[in-house]
Amino acid sequence: MIKPSKIFRIFYPSLLWQMPKTGKKCIYLTFDDGPHPLITPKVLEILRKYNAKATFFCIGNNVNKYPETFELIKREGHSIGSHTFNHENGWKTKTDDYVKSFQASNELIHSDLFRPPHGKIKRSQLKKLKTLNLKNDFQLSTFNFQLKIVAWTVIAYDWDHALSPEDVYQNVIRNANDGAIVAFHDSIKAYNNMISALPRVLEYYSQKGFIFKSL
């Protein structure tokens, strides 16, 4: 399912599925499962060539292991978000444990953006996350904010080894239009497909006058 079904959107209306149109044609690239010290810098290099900004949904344990790579993402001017601490599947995780995983990750990441791994989250988890006061929970004393839970408009399926880089490229360009949130992965599993498809996606939309912004 490259694009989420209408039923899924109806069931989770509070998730961010697509960005509103702003008058400038825009694609919102996102990358899940990093940071990775060998892969993420290559993604950043490609984005830099196209003056593209993106959003990286980072796993807390990876941030803990690779803090230099995490800091590099921020220095390059990209947005960051949490992707739990150990990539927990919400449908298979108790609500309290899921929330604790988010809290552990965001103690390192400090962001108001969160994407559920696999896109799987229980309504009880969603409700509890939405009620968190991040100022109190994470000592972000300068301001107070509510968590934004981000889904996607199009998922590239770059991690699927049954697909070729061409398949991944076509998945994106056939389905992503103005305001689309596109999900890639800066992970070992997705590397071969992602690293081949991403520059082509950037080139395709650049030629059509799109810009690439972070969330």
Predicted regions: what they are:
Residues 2-91, 97, 110-111, 211:
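Active-site beta->alpha N-cap acidic-glycine motif
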Residues 64-65, 85-211, 215:
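Catalytic domains of cell-wall/extracellular-matrix polysaccharide-remodeling enzymes
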